[in-house]
Amino acid sequence: MQIFVKTLTGKTITLEVESSDTIDNVKAKIQDKEGIPPDQQRLIFAGKQLEDGRTLADYNIQKESTLHLVLRLRGGAKKRKKKTYTKPKKIKHKHKKVKLAVLQFYKVDDATGKVTRLRKECPNNDCGAGTFMANHFDRHYCGKCGLTYVYNQKA
């Protein structure tokens, strides 16, 4: 039977084949006529790429069917260069986890069992209850709202 192969340039070539011929045989016949090596050929029929081991009958290719020949593209994307950085990477801060850290804000009197606060609590309504102020050598400072109480300094 006779089939047609449409090449990349739009030229149509005719091949004399049997329905029992494999795709490999068809590619070899195309190589004889066009000089394109079989490993670079891709044959398309009815929108499907034809695999080398199968026969023309497997794909229901009948007489005067047209196959489309396209070339196989080799390779992939362009290799990218590795970036070089001028500054070393910044080391992230590690959170220091202190077990039972709340105990440093309170003191329990041994004799009476009374609990007293060691730190001053921020009076600002925005901060809410339980927000303690930091003790500095000359002031109390709230880290949440920025409220600062400075100690009286004697001249």
From Swiss-Prot:
Domain Ubiquitin-like positions: 1-76
Organism: Oryza sativa subsp. japonica
Gene name of the encoded protein: RPS27AB
Designated name of the protein: Ubiquitin-ribosomal protein eS31y fusion protein
GO molecular function, one term: protein tag activity
Note: Ubiquitin is generally synthesized as a polyubiquitin precursor with tandem head to tail repeats. Often, there are one to three additional amino acids after the last repeat, removed in the mature protein. Alternatively, ubiquitin extension protein is synthesized as a single copy of ubiquitin fused to a ribosomal protein (either eL40 or eS31) or to an ubiquitin-related protein (either RUB1 or RUB2). Following translation, extension protein is cleaved from ubiquitin.
GO cellular component: cytoplasm; nucleus; plastid; ribonucleoprotein complex; ribosome
Cross-link Glycyl lysine isopeptide (Lys-Gly) (interchain with G-Cter in ubiquitin) residue location(s): 48, 63
Alphabetical GO biological process terms: modification-dependent protein catabolic process; protein ubiquitination; translation
